[in-house]
Amino acid sequence: MMPAKLQLDVLRTLQSSARHGTQTLKNSNFLERFHKDRIVFCLPFFPALFFVPVQKVLQHLCLRFTQVAPYFIIQLFDLPSRHAENLAPLLASCRIQYTNCFSSSSNGQVPSIISLYLRVDLSPFYAKKFQIPYRVPMIWLDVFQVFFVFLVISQHSLHS
């Protein structure tokens, strides 16, 4: 079981990330996932390929969650395969698993757990952190994310 202090540290980190990504996490939703020993990030990278250096974003996430590696498996969804291959050692070092929602996973099914949906791909926070021009209107981010979630649910329905 994760120590209580570490639980609070992780919760604060996630809440901070969520605020920067314009989405607030509820304590109850997050704490439910402690019993699963799993944190899942659903990052819609497909609209972000030309806007965000994926490697820098992932390195930032890895650094923030290295301390929870003994307690959690952290999954990233829909990471372009070329980035996944290049970052395999980095992801493995933090027990971060990569799953592509648009191809068959190891067990032939699209994972159904999407517990934490952080808007970190094109958020103003990451744009500022990595000196990326933030030119995408927020309305389009919402459209992309709704579309992405719809695709994930559709893919999961097809496989079940």
UniProtKB/Swiss-Prot annotation:
The transmembrane residues are 39-59, 136-156
Gene Ontology CC terms: membrane
Q: How does it sit in the membrane?
A: Multi-pass membrane protein
- Where found? Membrane
Residue runs in coiled coils: none
Which keywords does the record carry? Membrane, Transmembrane, Transmembrane helix
Family to which this protein belongs? Belongs to the UPF0479 family.
**What other comment is given for this protein?**
Completely overlaps YHR219W.
According to UniProt, the name of this protein is: Putative UPF0479 protein YHR219C-A
What organism, scientifically named, is this protein from?
Answer: Saccharomyces cerevisiae (strain ATCC 204508 / S288c) (Baker's yeast)
